């Protein structure tokens, strides 16, 4: 009986941190969307680590806060109304996680179209806050 109880406690100990990480990461994603929709691209960039790398489709890698801010500002001229849906968060330890999700957004112009895709983010905990360390996405389902 003692082994069963210890086993249950062990499994709960593994599940609880992962679900807490997911909730914290989803909260940062909500903040990312809020900043983007307000046009606060310095705010968006502040959610990335200082040495973050963004790998946008069909473009060169983007590194560092200033370049990430400029990239999102330029992107917002063409698209808006982003929606992020976390599908899975895998803990990589107490200060790192991997997120897989999907997104949708709308193109700007006379005939806006919805664009959908998928993404992977590697998260790092910096000073108690989750930050995007590597961010890659592409379109399609």
Per-range role (PLM):
Residues 32, 44-45, 52, 64, ...:
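Hydrophobic pocket/interface hotspot
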Residues 41, 51, 59-61, 105-106, ...:
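Solvent-exposed loop/turn segments at secondary-structure junctions
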Residues 69-111:
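Surface-exposed, charged secondary-structure patches
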């Amino acid at each position: 009986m003692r082994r069963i109880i210890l086993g249950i406690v062990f499994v709960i100990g593994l599940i609880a941190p992962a679900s807490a990480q997911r909730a914290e990461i989803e909260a940062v994603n909500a903040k990312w969307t809020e900043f983007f929709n307000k046009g606060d691209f310095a705010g968006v960039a502040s959610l990335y680590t200082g040495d973050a790398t963004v790998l946008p489709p069909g473009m060169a890698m983007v590194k560092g806060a200033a370049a990430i801010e400029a990239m999102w500002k330029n992107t917002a001229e063409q698209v808006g109304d982003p929606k992020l849906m976390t599908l899975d968060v895998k803990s990589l330890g107490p200060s790192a996680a991997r997120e897989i999700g999907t997104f949708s957004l709308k193109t700007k112009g006379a005939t806006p179209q919805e664009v959908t895709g998928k993404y992977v983010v590697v998260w790092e905990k910096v000073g108690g806050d989750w930050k995007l360390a590597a961010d890659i996405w592409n379109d399609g389902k």
